[in-house]
């Protein structure tokens, strides 16, 4: 068995309390600035999602539009015990919709959220000195830069090495273009936790420290989620920020990820005051995740309706390792 290097930091489990989440929504509900951010994101999400969904293959599309793998189809057929083509045909469309959305939803979220919190989305040609960048913000004498990934297992070894090379090679040019001496670079992940990451993100830091002369490293990667170095009088800090850590940093407040969740729910989930009386779940822990037993009978916020509370807990679970009724 291959042993992990001891220098990789061992993260604790990240636990969310439903009571804390509800309190955060109450706090946001009476904050005019936060409410406006949510409403602005809701409008933008709706517009972009509607446009994107319209471009996806629909029931009338021909089979070649779905780019199906015959091997996956047959393995799935065996797993489901299907007998007729009509049975698997019903599963092809939703499966394609999920896979198509997964590749685009992350980028859409970046484009919506970055300007709301004072950042600019970066668009650049492949293999240019800015191709690694997705977001930037000039903050006094600090240039804040970010490369963003949609999930915690998106990287492989080669990508990790390439990102490190891009940072070390281009940091001086980035700084001089904006007349700053300090760069705060983030490898950001839109959801997930440090624990469920495949740790290839941390290897960006290790690869940086292997490229930079030891005397120029002020904070090594060992047992840290960031490192720091200097090059040509430019001071560079590089951090790995996953899930809530990224959103807290982007918005410079601890409720940013809740704001994102509420905006998404408002944009995507039809609001009613009722609950789902017939709900039955297949996933073992889904009932406990989305249970609203902890919600007081008199709990009331204008941003969400009662049927949307389970969605709030459902989304929150994607940013933590455990969610508890406390």
Predicted regions and their residues:
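A short, terminal or domain-edge coil/loop segment
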Residues: 85-86, 92, 179-194, 248-253
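Catalytic cores of nucleic-acid endonucleases
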Residues: 150-227
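Interdomain/boundary linker segments immediately adjacent to catalytic/signaling cores
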Residues: 2-107
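Charged, structured surface patches that assemble and position nucleic-acid processing machinery
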Residues: 200-326
